[in-house]
Amino acid sequence: MSSTEATVFDVIVIGGGHAGCEAASAAARAGARTALVTHRFDTIGVMSCNPAIGGLGKGHLVREIDALDGLMGRVADEAGIQFRLLNRRKGPAVRGPRTQADRKLYRLAMQKMIAAQDNLFVVEGGAHDLREEHGRITGVVLSDGRTLSCGAVVLTTGTFLNGLIHIGEKKIPAGRMGEKPALGLSERLTSFGFALGRLKTGTPPRLDGRTIDWQSLDMQSADEEPVPFSLMTDRITIPQIDCGITRTTPETHAVIRANLHRSAMYSGSIEGIGPRYCPSVEDKIVKFGDRDGHQIFLEPEGLDDDTVYPNGISTSLPEDVQLDILKTIPGLETAAMLQPGYAIEYDFIDPRELKRSLETRKVTGLFLAGQINGTTGYEEAGAQGLLAGINAARRASGGDPVIIQRTEAYIGVMVDDLTSRGVSEPYRMFTSRAEFRLSLRADNADQRLTPLADKLGILGHARKERFEARETALDEARSLTQSLTITPNLASRYDLRLNQDGVRRSAYDLLSYPEIDLDRLKSIWPELGAVDPATREALEIEAQYAVYMDRQKSDIAVMEREEQLLIPAGLDIDGISGLSNELKHKLKQRRPETIAEAQRVDGMTPAALALLIAQIKKFGYRQRAASELSEGQGAA
């Protein structure tokens, strides 16, 4: 919906970036009267850094957002101009859907969805302060003096919280280039007792594509058959483009080394820690100086935009040095720089200050999502925003929080990592972070999470119908393949080599064999040809993983039993004999809610965990004894 003069809401979301859009949409879908506070409507959904969505691990998050009826997957499908399925030759569990996006199309598609959402009102203005009474959030004060009342706030400030841009020795207070930072909120968060830290991220210079020598470059094409992110997308209709590939050279490295003292990163100007997996070009040269070159992907920012994003040369060097660097890179020797690269520092809060609902422990009704929690990336932000929005709506209405377990989704893995371990650098999602990644595949996100969205009341009617139709088709195909059987002797007539043990095997069993798919089995059972392509792919993947999934289910059951063992809020940590003072301090500081969370506290040992479990059991005995005594006295 458009802007409103109303001042009373159930939920207020501060920030119109990727976390804020998902939070506002989710809260509104959950039935909360929601305000999205942002400086300007036309900056909603802006891609501040790279023009891409998805990738390894990140693509899983986008699919999970979509499965919960979030926005990012559908928006990316409307704006994607180079779809590629990463790790296509590897197993389905580690494949990563990705697309480059047209910045303008992405922004406009997101704004369209925000404007169309019932219960959602956009309030243009800056958030200056938070209102709190007796440890509970009550509202937001805008920079123009207006006060908005609410039952919960979701803070999604991105890089705007005390944001400071660095270009060489130049320092510019900003949330991103050309936009003012959020200053008052940091002071209020400090007054609440939160300890703020500083993190850093960076972006490369933007180039004029008309001045790049594309003919001298290797080119990378999109997939011939683009794989959409969203269940709601039938096919990709946006024209697909190529990207250029080039590399830094020894001359590039020489220019950088000669000017390291002028880099904000290496001159001591920047206090914040940057993302390890997205290093600046200065970092690459210093840490990997033995390499003769580093790859650069030249990514056009839009179908009708000449701006090019050179992915791989993020930098905080001065503008003149950036120009000298470009002259040493093949294909970029005469490239014009439209905007210099820069580093940006911003405040964040230790995510161990959060519950797994993403509500802060110190202030009831205050939720945090995105880079303020120490993460990096649009996808990580969007996933947190969606969960925070759901729980903010439930907090405002008096409902119980929704906790997504790490056994259920990459969202659960990320939130559990953040709230139990904290961050020492910007957190990025990888498939390797998930213990149960065979179960948490991108292709089965809908099966894992859409029933939850339905239960929570945030699932749209059209998606529910499509999901149920897909599940029905899969159930029917599974039943069909399980009903069709063949002996090893007969299978040999169709060039299927099976163990000659006389055991009949079903078509479903055969799909778990290497190089056997439904196309091959159609020669035996022609009726399999009626299975549609989407169902066929889902069935083949399911059958391939069936044996491994059964094993993983038992492992998940063990972890879930641990998750269910709650640590009572009144447990006397200091009274645990044999537990080190250091661990007592950490447990009191972080206040884990379950044994599984306590297990991930730094320094926790099996022996210490056993002491904690014993104390919980003693606490339970005392509670039961006190209850029985009270009941006995009442009866007397």
Curated annotation (Swiss-Prot):
GO terms for cellular component: cytosol. This is tRNA uridine 5-carboxymethylaminomethyl modification enzyme MnmG. Its main location: cytoplasm. GO terms for biological process: tRNA methylation; tRNA wobble uridine modification. Pfam families: GIDA, GIDA_C_1st, SAM_GIDA_C. The lineage of its organism: Bacteria, Pseudomonadati, Pseudomonadota, Alphaproteobacteria, Hyphomicrobiales. GO terms for molecular function: flavin adenine dinucleotide binding. HAMAP family: MnmG_GidA. The keyword Transcription does not apply. It comes from Brucella anthropi (strain ATCC 49188 / DSM 6882 / CCUG 24695 / JCM 21032 / LMG 3331 / NBRC 15819 / NCTC 12168 / Alc 37). Keywords: Cytoplasm, FAD, Flavoprotein, NAD, tRNA processing. Belongs to the MnmG family. NAD-binding protein involved in the addition of a carboxymethylaminomethyl (cmnm) group at the wobble position (U34) of certain tRNAs, forming tRNA-cmnm(5)s(2)U34. Its cofactor is FAD. Homodimer. Heterotetramer of two MnmE and two MnmG subunits. It is found in: Cytoplasm. PANTHER family: GLUCOSE INHIBITED DIVISION PROTEIN A, PROTEIN MTO1 HOMOLOG, MITOCHONDRIAL. Gene3D superfamilies: FAD/NAD(P)-binding domain, GidA associated domain, C-terminal subdomain, tRNA uridine 5-carboxymethylaminomethyl modification enzyme MnmG/GidA.
